[in-house]
Amino acid sequence: MSTFDNAVSIHPYFKVREGQLEACKSFLTRFNEKVAGEAKCLFYNFTFQGDVMCCREAYQDAEGVQAHLENVGALLGELLKIADLTRIELHGPAPELEKLKPVFAEMNPEYFICECGIGR
C-alpha cells in the first residue's frame, strides 16, 4: 500500500494584511520548526503571489491532519493576527475527508475527492 492511498492535502489561502508581508514571512520559520517533527507529514511549504499566501501541505491520512492541527493550533492563532484566512481546500479520498468534516466545519472548506492518480 502506497503512503498516498489515504493521503490528504490541505490548501489554506491567506491574505496578508497591509504592511505585514515581511513579518509574515519571518514568522513562517516557527511553523516549519514545529511541523518538522510530525511523523505523518508528507510535505509542508508556503507559496506567495503578492500578498496572498498558500500553505501547501499533505499528510498520510486524516489522523495526520488532526495531529498537525493540534500541533500548530496556537501558532495559527498568532498568524491570524497578521493574515486573514480567505479560503481552504481539502483534497483526498472520500473516507478520509469524511473523518475531517467535523474538524473543519467552522472553516467552511471546499472538499475535492480524489478519483484516480499515482503515488511514488
Model regions and ranges:
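Long, charge-enriched, surface-exposed interaction segments in small proteins/subunits
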Residues: 73-74
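Short S/T/G/P-rich N-terminal loop/turn motif that feeds into the first structured element of a domain
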Residues: 1-54, 60-70, 81-120
